Amino acid sequence: MRAKWRKKRMRGLKRKRRKMRQRSK
């Protein structure tokens, strides 16, 4: 169960990072 929320959080972080990169471009 702990890995479940951890995987979801990691996915959200990756998505946010992608948006940040586009803004920097």
UniProtKB/Swiss-Prot annotation:
Keywords: Cytoplasm, Ribonucleoprotein, Ribosomal protein
TM ranges: none
Molecular function as annotated in GO: structural constituent of ribosome
Main localization of the protein described in the UniProt heading: cytoplasm
InterPro entries tied to this protein: Ribosomal_eS32
A GO cellular component annotation in the UniProt record: ribonucleoprotein complex
Name listed for the protein in its UniProt record: Small ribosomal subunit protein eS32
Other facts noted in the record for this chain: Initially thought to be part of the large ribosomal subunit. Crystal structures show eS32/eL41 to be a small ribosomal subunit forming a bridge at the interface of the 2 subunits.
Function, as annotated: Component of the small ribosomal subunit. The ribosome is a large ribonucleoprotein complex responsible for the synthesis of proteins in the cell.
Summary of subunit composition and partner proteins: Component of the small ribosomal subunit.
